[in-house]
Curated annotation (Swiss-Prot):
<dbReference type="Pfam" id="PF10398">
    <property type="entry name" value="DUF2443"/>
</dbReference>
<dbReference type="InterPro" id="IPR038018">
    <property type="entry name" value="HP_1531"/>
</dbReference>
<protein>
    <recommendedName>
        <fullName>Uncharacterized protein HP_1531</fullName>
    </recommendedName>
</protein>
<dbReference type="InterPro" id="IPR019469">
    <property type="entry name" value="DUF2443"/>
</dbReference>
Length: 79
């Protein structure tokens, strides 16, 4: 069980690093990304749709990893 938790935590860290790198390449903050995703802000001209899609997919992967970790946490703490 703990090995699975360590693997998920390592994957979360990798995903976080990938997101940070993509945000730096696009000169965006995480807040900017969220605003663009919500439609509250226009996408900058220097960021193409394919790049934004890649960033969105990585954020979705991070969300899935966090959900998996939360699921394990709930399973461990129920007794």
């Amino acid at each position: 069980m703990f090995e699975k938790i360590r693997k998920i935590l390592a994957d979360i860290e990798d995903s976080q690093n990938e997101i940070e790198m993509l945000l730096k390449l696009a000169n965006l903050s995480l807040g900017d990304f969220i605003e663009i995703k919500r439609g509250s802000m226009d996408m900058p001209k220097g960021v193409n749709e394919a790049f934004f899609t890649q960033l969105s997919e990585e954020v979705e992967r991070l969300k899935e990893l966090i959900n998996a970790l939360n699921k394990i946490k709930k399973g461990l703490l129920v007794f």
